[in-house]
Amino acid sequence: MSQDRRYSFEFFPTKTDAGHEKLIATARHLATYNPDFFSCTYGAGGSTRDRTLNTVLQLENEVKVPAAPHLSCVGDSKDDLRGLLTQYKAAGITRIVALRGDLPSGMGMASGEMRHANDLVEFIREETGDHFHIEVAAYPEMHPQARNFEDDLTNFVRKANAGANSAITQYFFNADSYFYFVERVRAMGVNIPIVPGIMPITNYSKLARFSDACGAEIPRWIRKQLEAYGDDTQSIQGFGEQVITEMCERLLQGGAPGLHFYTLNQAEPSLAVWKNLKLPR
């Protein structure tokens, strides 16, 4: 893969054996495009811990693409996290996505020995030194639970200063929000790479639901066009592919250090954009 930019794909661990087999088949297909790594999510409050572990080990050892597990601190003890770090290190995992994590339904505030992502980054560094390349999350349109944008910028700086190597953003559909976020944190002294997270558009109702939950803004012109297509899946996907391709072109032309695709365990929507961009293989 390009030494100047990095490209990666994200999966979520499935609940069924059939779903897992499909995930691995998708990963094998995407592996032929030589991504820099695959990441694998971690359920709210660590609810998919074992499935995340098993998926990551299979991606790393069988699919032969470096795997980066998500690791969150909400609801987990330091002993739990220490055990996971030991397992990942022993398995040859060298990259981790360190997050506070989503709160399980009914949990009003973060619990556990560590409540913030910067605490987790510091803990990983204390326990493992420089073994892991640590990714953290960035929110160009502000974390949905942040009090305001300035507070959110400060929180990001804390994570970076705690020992993060790079960051992956929440997905967005307005390139200007990414460029503004990067400009602001650079002015605050943060120089780590900040890679845009990319969500292909394939289903409007699912996209709207995800976006409401995570605070990603769907611009009015995109929303109105998607609504106008109704149940015309082919038109939605064609329009979505064009919109995301054009945004990625602008991001890369503007200096973004790569792209991180949220696949939702599907290869083709991300690969359609990849091919349009003529990314290296």
Where do the protein language model's features map onto the residues?
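Active-site beta-loop-alpha junctions enriched in small/polar residues
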Residues: F11-T14, T41-G45, H70-D76, G101-D102, ...
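Active-site-adjacent beta->alpha loops and helix N-cap segments on the catalytic face
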Residues: A18-H20, G46-L59, S77-G83, D102-I124, ...
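Active-site mouth loops of central-metabolism enzymes
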Residues: R6-K22, A67-D79, H133-D151, A228-Q242
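Acidic (Asp/Glu)-rich catalytic clusters
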Residues: M1-S2, A27-N34, L53-K64, L85-I93, ...
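Conserved beta-strand positions in the central sheet of alpha/beta enzyme cores
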Residues: S8, S39, V97-A98, I168, ...
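Conserved, mostly hydrophobic/aromatic
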Residues: E10, F38, Y88, K159, ...
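Active-site pocket-lining/capping segments in soluble small-molecule metabolic enzymes
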Residues: A18, G112-Y139, A187-E241, E246, ...
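Conserved N-terminal beta1-alpha1 strand-loop-helix module at the mouth
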Residues: M1-C40
